[in-house]
């Protein structure tokens, strides 16, 4: 492990928006705990909050952000807020869904993603066209996708969109490399967000990971986060404990050796922690 004191904690998207390189995810946060946990994450230094309509906590996330900014005299523009469209359907349903998200959040959206390509080509393209209009109005600052495979991305590019996707959020960790999608995104300047980067905690005691982390004198969680960062991804992590929030964010003052990054990358098993199926291969 080597120290890296000058590493940036943000990255610039293709549209010029600056996004923090680590996000705090609100997936499966209990409704009655979400406000406190998002507030705690902001107190811990997170400036990137990731929610979605299907999480059922957009209203709590939005209120926590607005309240925290007011209490701490922080500009709303200093916080990066992501939400997602639950389902691709038709143009008008997508517009209604976006208006609903904006209402629940009580603030503009920095990044809005199509959460799943499910629904078919016609629905995907119609949903994207609707999203673009909210970029024009300023209610959404950036648009992107989630769980898009290469064919879905190619389809979107072929539709001659007004705005190209800034981000593709997919499941990524050493046990699921998604090399074809990663390569396509990198070649088209699409930032890659990694969800389930800590494997939902399932592999934190993995016999392959534990000795590597021990040798580097870091936690397995920090090892996985550094792997994600050094691969060029933006990990979306979640924790309900303050000490874990802090340690998971304390990863910008060191790097792991390139050979360790390569070793971790060799662990690919096409194993999904977040789902029992591959959402990137739907028609």
UniProtKB/Swiss-Prot annotation:
Q: Mainly localized where?
A: cytoplasm
Site entry (Lowers pKa of active site Tyr), positions = 84
Q: Where in the cell is it found?
A: Cytoplasm; Nucleus
Instruction: Kindly list the GO molecular function terms attached to this UniProt entry.
Output: aldose reductase (NADPH) activity; D-xylose reductase (NADPH) activity; L-arabinose reductase (NADPH) activity
User: Which CDD domains does this one have?
Assistant: AKR_AKR1-5-like
Q: Which UniProt keywords apply?
A: Cytoplasm, Nucleus, Oxidoreductase
The residues responsible for catalysis, as annotated, are: 55 (proton donor)
Q: Which SUPFAM superfamilies does the entry mention? A: NAD(P)-linked oxidoreductase (SSF51430)
Q: What's the top EC group for this one?
A: oxidoreductase
**EC number(s) per entry:** 1.-.-.-
Q: Which GO terms describe its biological process?
A: arabinose catabolic process; D-xylose catabolic process
Q: Which InterPro entries match?
A: AKR, Aldo/ket_reductase_CS, NADP_OxRdtase_dom, NADP_OxRdtase_dom_sf
Q: Name one GO cellular component term.
A: cytoplasm
Q: Which family does it belong to?
A: Belongs to the aldo/keto reductase family.
Protein's UniProt name: Uncharacterized oxidoreductase P32A8.02
Provide the organism lineage as a comma list: Eukaryota, Fungi, Dikarya, Ascomycota, Taphrinomycotina
């Amino acid at each position: 492990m080597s120290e890296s004191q000058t590493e940036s904690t943000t990255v610039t998207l293709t549209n010029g928006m600056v996004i923090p390189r680590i996000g705090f995810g609100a997936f499966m946060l209990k409704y009655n705990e979400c406000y406190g946990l998002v507030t705690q994450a902001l107190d811990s230094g997170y400036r990137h909050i990731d929610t979605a309509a299907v999480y059922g906590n957009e209203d709590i996330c939005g209120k926590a952000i607005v309240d925290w900014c007011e209490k701490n005299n922080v500009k709303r523009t200093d916080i990066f807020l992501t939400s997602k469209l639950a389902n691709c359907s038709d143009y008008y349903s997508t517009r209604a869904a976006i208006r609903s998200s904006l209402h629940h959040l009580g603030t503009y959206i920095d990044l809005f993603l199509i959460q799943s390509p499910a629904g078919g080509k016609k629905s995907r393209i119609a949903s994207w066209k609707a999203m673009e209009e909210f970029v024009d109005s300023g209610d959404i600052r950036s648009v992107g996708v989630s769980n898009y495979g290469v064919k879905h991305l190619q389809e979107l590019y072929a539709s001659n969109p007004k705005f190209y996707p800034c981000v593709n959020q997919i499941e990524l960790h050493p046990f699921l490399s998604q090399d074809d999608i990663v390569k396509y995104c990198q070649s088209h300047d699409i930032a890659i967000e990694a969800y389930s980067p800590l494997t939902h905690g399932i592999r934190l005691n993995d016999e392959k990971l534990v000795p590597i982390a021990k040798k580097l004198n870091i936690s397995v969680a920090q090892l996985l986060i550094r792997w994600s960062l050094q691969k060029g991804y933006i990990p979306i992590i979640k924790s309900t404990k303050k000490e874990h929030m802090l340690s998971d964010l304390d990863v910008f003052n060191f790097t792991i050796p390139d050979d360790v990054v390569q070793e971790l990358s060799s662990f690919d098993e096409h194993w999904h922690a977040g789902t029992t199926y591959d959402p990137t291969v739907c028609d």
